[in-house]
Amino acid sequence: LETHHVIPFGSSWWWGGWLIFAVYGAVVFWIGKSATEATRERFERWWGWVILGFFAFGQFYQVLDGSWSLQESLPLHLCWFSRFLAVLYLTFRQKWALVPLFFWGIVGGFHSFLTPESTLGSSSFMLVEYYFSHAGIILVPLYSVFVGGWRIPANGWLQAFFWNNVLLLPIYLINLAVGGNYMFLVAPPVAENPFVVGEWPYYILGFEAAALLHYGVLRLIFFNYLLPKRATA
């Protein structure tokens, strides 16, 4: 069975992904802005459960169609970590999760829409799941800022970059143990991306530079939403 599936730029599924993102975003922001505080809190908890449910059903779906494997199906890509951070914030009210989620989710999610590569196959369900999950990791941190009033720590971009690097060694060792390519630490992604240059291990240095650049730019874009210096997150 096909596992890695690159969605061509400008194809029907590529545009369909952006449509899913737009509808998804419109719905959650409309609910968040129009609901009472109590209703909004219930909605957020259920939103987290839905995100987690999509993950669980995706794993079950792979088991049923025989495509589940240690090499491809473990939730060890950065976008998967972002999904769990979203659940921790929405359902379990863990605000600390927002700092890495804001930077990992928005940057990783954006590139997952721009140059989409499904690592779990090309079935219609897995493509919808791909777009739903990546839309979520963009929308949850944006929702937390524009609906929840959360403010970003001034050094949050450096915190996110630090935890990026903390994950590298354990994920690389897991890759060696199971023969996987989680976080693309063994081989570059198949989808073309201008920030992926060279072979192993040199393209990883490009990942590092691109992450720091993207996080810094995101901090500048959201400069007016930074946490005041004397406040705490």
Question: PLM features: residue spans?
Answer:
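Membrane-interface helix-boundary motifs at transmembrane edges
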Residues: 33-44, 91-97, 147-158
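Aromatic-anchored segments of alpha-helical transmembrane domains
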Residues: 51-60, 105-116, 164-174
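Structural signature of hydrophobic alpha-helical transmembrane segments
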Residues: 14-21, 66-79, 99-102
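Membrane-interface transmembrane-helix boundary segments in multi-pass integral membrane proteins
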Residues: 5-22, 159-162, 166, 176-215
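Hydrophobic cores of alpha-helical transmembrane segments in multi-pass inner/ER membrane proteins
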Residues: 17-29, 80-91, 133-147, 203-222
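Membrane-interface helix caps and helix-loop-helix hairpins in membrane proteins
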Residues: 63-72, 92-96, 116-128
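A glycine-rich, hydrophobic loop/mini-helix early in the fold
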Residues: 40-90
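A contiguous pocket-lining binding segment that forms or flanks enzyme active sites
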Residues: 114-164
